[in-house]
Amino acid sequence: MLQGELCALNKSSNSLFAMYRILLIVSVFVWNVSAFAQSGKLVGTVVDGSTGETMPGTRILVEGTNLTTLTNFDGEYSLSAAAGTYTILVKSFGFSNKSISGVVIKPGGETSLNVTMEFAKGEALEVVTITASASRENVNALLIQQKSLSSVSDGISSESIRRTPDRNTGDVLKRVSGASIQDNKFAIVRGLNDRYNAAYLNGAPLPSTESDRKAFAFDVFPAALLDNLVIVKTASAELPGEFAGGVIQVNTKSFPGKAFHEFSFSTSYNTITTFKDRLDYQGSSTDWLGVDNGARALPTNMPTSNQMFQLTSAERVQVASKFKNDWALQNKTFLPALSFQYSGGSSKDIGTKRLGAIYSLTYNQSNQYNTTRRQSWQNAVGSTEESLMESDLLDDNYVVNTLAGALANISYSAGPNTTIGWKNLYSITSQDRVLMRNGTRQPIDAPNQVLRQSARWFTNNQILSSQLNGSHYFESFKGKLQWLASYSGISRSVPNLRNTLYYGDTDVPDTSWRAGITSTSVGPDYSGSRFYGLNLEGITSGQATFELPLDLVDLGIRNNLKVGIGGQYRDRTYTARQFGYVLANFMTFDQNLLNAPIEEIFGAQNMNATSGFSMREGTKSSDSYLANATTSFGFIQFDSRILEKTRLNWGLRAENFEQNMYSKTDNNDTVQVESTRLDILPSVNFIYSIDDAQNLRISYSRTLNRPEFRELAPFAFYDFQTRYVVTGNPSLVRSTIDNFDARYEWYPGKGQVFSVTAFYKNFINPIEQATREDVVTEYTFVNVPKAVDFGLEFEGRLLLSTLFGKPDHKVLNKMTVFANYALIRSQVSLNLPTAADSIRPLQGQSPYVVNAGIQYQNDESGTTISAAFNQVGDRIFIVGSSQEPSIWEKGRAVLDFSLNQEVNEKLSIKLTARDLLAPDLIFFNDIDNNQKWSEGDDQMWRSNFGPTISLGLTYRL
């Protein structure tokens, strides 16, 4: 079975690659339509001024002409007209008419006009007409959409993304209020561990990208493919129940306003990487695409694990001879990073129908070199004595990162009341790494021992997301129906991770290096180990929501009912195999072979049953597992405006969750987890509108956090970078969180915002990663009884003209300062006498998150300059035990700079600088228990980084 699962790697890669080709074909055959030279387009969105919701079925008329159209399900409209200046009339039943003057339509251009409508009471709805200018109306529409959301949320638009140096979605997340990034890819919202977030792509759930943690790596999506990114921080009945930090909604582009082509190219220089020497090894011819072509696969006709354990010594020698001698390392040079991207799109109006497509291809290859000093210590928890160093190692890391993606979205509007969309995204990320480790092991009461270790491995992630969605508006009773069916699949493979380990003696001058190989044991602690891992996961989901207004027009009462049902099925297959070279015959083995260099020691000439090596299977029965989970849900939600200034969004969500996991222990005993749980999740969001620009929000919700498949499985995996073994815990249970939020927000206009939020979260049975009591070099996952998390979050995005009280100042009106600061405290209640800290923060919780920056934007000259700063506070990485103190991560300060200059309407140049401060990344034992890095703490790992300077060109047709 294991062999068959590993063979599935090539099949899955081929099928995903086939989908990649299909997306390319779609992009090639989609037509492009050019605008007529003497006409232009008027496009925009109509929203309800009191709720911020879009208004389908609204009539748009061009006064003095016969031109008219209706908004579609999403409140959007598109209207072609001859070039000129017009007055636009907007009508919708139940709302005052709106007349907008001074609307300019340019030849061959596209004019954006977003409109807000005011709810009318009684007889006034048929006679009142409100007039406004085009420029002011656009600003008002943006303001209304920002302030009228029922949930607390923050986000960033595609236009803002273009002004940053960000390459992928992980970089973009750092710009969102209260968010930060760990390991350059995992989201931290309000300082909470990444496990408390939910990731959604165009409304459909995304599976975990990691085989060993509950997290989604947001670096898999190129930033150029995004339409917007929103983090919802408070729950409502329509949102998934499993989150406490935020629901991260990644939305890709759909209907283009007009036909376009865009080509981008950039290159970058890293101060400690580019043009420096690097070590490499023989990989495959398709590594540059981010995929392995099979060069790292297991040899053909390889015996299964069970068969390997039955082989004779001579037969194991034959198996050893099947493997290539692929251990040699080569000297190369790190070249500058390269990035290419093409995006295109078009739309065609066919009467009242509209067909549109957006497609994109992106490719990015970057390099990274850094050093990491790794130390381990012997120290008693709470002891005042100086710690004794057990090991002192220095890692040289040589990494090549590849990211490739394709997007193809097709949308069809069958008139103003029906829209069908098909959205597809395929992404490949890979990391090709060589690690060289040198240093000293100094066991207590033993001679010093030096080691030289090398590891080389290739990690590949492939994600395919495809979804079909529909939106329908029923004009007769103003009902809205939305449905979605989607599939997301992830393939994560680590083919042929190879490790060598040589030992020497510091007491012997010019020591000879000997490979650490025995006659019986194999694994990451021995030379010549090979590891093959494959994780296949898929999510199939579907949902439907229906929305109906229940307004009492005569009383001026607005009420909206939304109900929905849906479900998702998620399954995972994880398989792993491990091999290692051993002495075929201890008595007759040629000991001189252990002194052979890396490139020679495992050559075919050294595989024999008397004086050479054979191959032994190191796979354990716990190294594979199968798991699946089924979630079915239903919700009912009311959005009510009882008084003019008050709004109440409230509802109930029911989620039935069934989870199954099947595995084995190392002793081949069956491990089976079968659980079913029905949860009723209430949510209430109250909004009081102080005036047109200010809101006060109060909310409560109950949410969940469920154990990940990997966290339940007893599989043990050795992490070369941390030197820890990670194991699962089948006894984990789901956690519940009660969330309370209060927020004041002010929108002074022109895209400005200021807000203050207080939040409190009460956790029951939160899940943490903690050091095992019996093995201090292993960590697992545990439930702690209770925890609380509370804090304040400040956000501001203001023009300098507003700050200095000079609204008409030309320069200050072009400069925006933005900042958000989250101050967070958490406390875990421990009933465990063996806990490392009697009072401590929640694992992964940062005490503060800071994002700040300044931007200058001159539309006349086409110049945009921005600088952004991000930092988080020190946080617990791994919870300690009675034998071992907790490991903490020191927060890094990140400073980025960007300059974008439009040369003309088609060409722009972008200069960026990332991580200008480049502080070291430090993990440490908090010896003095002050919950931060300070002199006297034991340093565990310390990695260095260098700034990256990039130069890019973008050309638009």
Question: Model-flagged regions — what are they?
Answer:
Residues A204-P205, P597-F613, E658, Y688, ...:
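Surface-exposed extracellular loop regions of Gram-negative outer-membrane beta-barrel proteins
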Residues F36-V127:
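Periplasm-facing N-terminal accessory domains of Gram-negative outer-membrane beta-barrel systems
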Residues V104, A134-I188, D194, G203-A237, ...:
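Periplasmic N-terminal accessory/gating domains of Gram-negative outer-membrane beta-barrel systems
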Residues V47, R59, E63, K91-F93, ...:
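Short, acidic, small-residue-rich periplasmic hinge/interaction motif at the N-terminus
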Residues G523, N535, G542-T545, L593-L594, ...:
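Outer membrane beta-barrel strand-and-loop segments of large Gram-negative receptors
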Residues K41, F323-L435, L464, V684:
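Transmembrane beta-barrel wall of Gram-negative outer-membrane proteins
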